[in-house]
Amino acid sequence: MSVRARAVTIALLLGVAGGVPGSLPAQFGYFGQNKIQYQSFAWRVLPGEHVDLYFYPEEEELARVALGYAEESYGVLERRFSHSVQHRIPLIIYASHTDFEQTNVLPYAPPEELLGVTDFLKRRVTLPFTGNYADFRHTLRHELVHVFQLSLATEAYLRYPRTTHAALPLWWTEGLAEYFSAGEDARDEMILRELTVSGRLPTLPQLQYAGGGIIYPIGGSILRYLGTTYGDWRIASLYHDIWKYQSFDDALRELYGRTLAQLSDEWQYWMRRRYFIDVAASKPLALTASLITRLAIKPTAYRLPGDTTTRVLYFSPADGYASIYSRNLEGHDTHIVVHGERTPQFESFHYFESRIGVNPAGIAVFGSRFESRDALMFWNLKADKLVGRYQFPDIVSILSPTWAPDGRSVVFSGLAVSGYSDLYRLWLPEGRLERLTSDRFQDIDPSVSPDGRTVVFASDRTPFGAQGAKNLFLLDLATGTVRYLTYGNWQDETPRWAPSGRIWFTSDRDGSLQIYSVDSAGTGRRETQALGGAFDPQFVDSTAGFVFGGFADLSFNLYHATARSDTGPSVVALDPAPPSATWQWPELTEPAVAQAVPTPYKQHYGLDFAAGEAAVAPGLGSEQGAVLLFSDLLNDHQLVGTVSSFAYSGSGFGNLLDNISGSLFYLNQTHRTNWGIGAYRLRGLFYENDFTSLFQETSYGVLGQLRYPLSRFRRLEAEFRLEHSDRFDFASSVVSEPRRVAWLAANYLTFVKDNSLWLPTGPIDGERYTATAGLVNDVNHGRFDS
């Protein structure tokens, strides 16, 4: 499973290192939030040498890229693990996270921080494309590492069956997937540096049962230390020889000649040597900036008409739900502007990758998930109400909208149904949409110049883009020409224009996230040297300085600081002649990929789960039962069968057959309306009410179920049953007719609402309730029954 920096960010924003809040999946007759199939995908299969890639036509070019990189990754991992996977690997891709949230591979709607998953049952790899080629490659290889891990574990267990096997901790399995895929980025380094310098870096024994997103960078750094110090070959040896050991500690002691505690001490010392040097060159944010608020991200400074007070809009999950807050620079007068994650029109703000725009009239614009795709939302900050909403049929995700100075248009980054990320311009009030860029590159974080003629944005349209680099570019709105503003093998992002014409942005060019500013020629300087990291800047004015996000004390916070004098030294300069050539998706030119012929997806049911039990009570009888679950590869179709029986002692085989119960149920999840049909036979002794009413019943019948989600938080359910019932109540004093033989028709209609917020310990906020109306009719006797 791949979570990476998103989950780490969210977990730390919530102050919870052990997990990310979520919700239970929706089930018939129970609570849980809904996963909605807004569209039916026309799935096709693209075969490779080792991988079968499942895709839909809108993303075919992306599918070929994914297949090429999957086969390349297979070859790399085959050599690193000295192992070949003995089955074809199903790889399912989605063109956006919005589409991914409709997948039936998972029983729940995947949260935004989940970027990929490898399941244990069918060994499927499922992941979305989020617009960035390098991130997609990273996640794909991360998940393929898990495929090899599962294959090696299965091989060891089958060849050398034992009652107990050494269990690998999560930090090892996820850390190895990170180490073998790409390694730590600047945000991972930021968290590792803070843990090390603050003395909070956990030991390896403390990590044995740890979970949550934070284990990804920690585990990756541990495996990097072990690989660079002792050699990667020992990692592969552990998987081949794990069957020999009773515990993970025993395996480490044999392979590395060190105990777990000794390896922990070595790694901790390695980390201190790596990060303590940064203390001398940097200063904590507490010494260089003023804190606005903790547990917050993506600040936007603004002033309402007629008000001289500078306030900041930002995202925060301070109450458990991610909402939009407003606060003044002094850190007082805080209130929630828009409540998020509780209603259909504000389902998600994508707050870890999108920001808010505010114009001089006090109208805030932001992207929000609304039903099947994102919408541009316009919120009047003074009137405190929604004043506009725009959605576009070909755009599924909207990020970082920004106003043009004249207030007549909004520029934003949009992800198309094909998976391509481009810049768009919405003209107001007519709602006309103009596409500003159109290519395979990821174009994000736009900001319009004070004169309204130019857009600065971050993009991977640089020769280093395939490796994850982003540079800043200037787009001339009159001509459509694009030119470099910064250039280099690093990540420059979140640019914003200041009133003076300077551009403030975030960069990791010196190894950590810091704030820089440049003029329109690309010449400028570093503005911060924060120990934890500084990012997402916005220059306000010479009095208020600039606001920005920072990381300190294992928390994402907001700060403001005084800007340096314009006479400071120049430390940033644009290459006098950056290359005009960009880069192309190299996998598309590989013959095996280009010549692969897709075929329509065909349903083939496979056994997912089987379980059985038997019990014998001497002198009383025996009982036995089994359950089987079948599904197709995409889990759109499920088939569940059960069978059980009981026999009284000495009653013989005939009694066993007479007391058989069984059921068969089919569930179709291909459309928004999920439906199921089934048949059953039940026989046995049952209790009801307070367990004082004992009855014996033999029944058989059919049933049908429907589930229609109105939104993520509300749904309708309906059920119809027609059964023949032969029932005898032993508590004859309670009922007037001890025996009832009849055909019964039952109808139920249920409304469910659930926007509750969950932690591993249970719900902590929100509400959930259900209301059911039902009617059971005794067809034979023309009366209602129960």
Regions found by a protein language model. Give the residues of each.
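A flexible loop/linker signature enriched in serine peptidases of the S9 family
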Residues: 292-294, 315-325, 340-353, 365-377, ...
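Outer-membrane beta-barrel strand-turn architecture
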Residues: 305, 452, 507, 550, ...
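Outer-membrane beta-barrel initiation region
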Residues: 556-557, 562-676, 740-765
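Beta/coil-rich, acidic/histidine-enriched accessory regions frequently appended to metallopeptidases
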Residues: 30-37, 42-45, 208-213, 237-355, ...
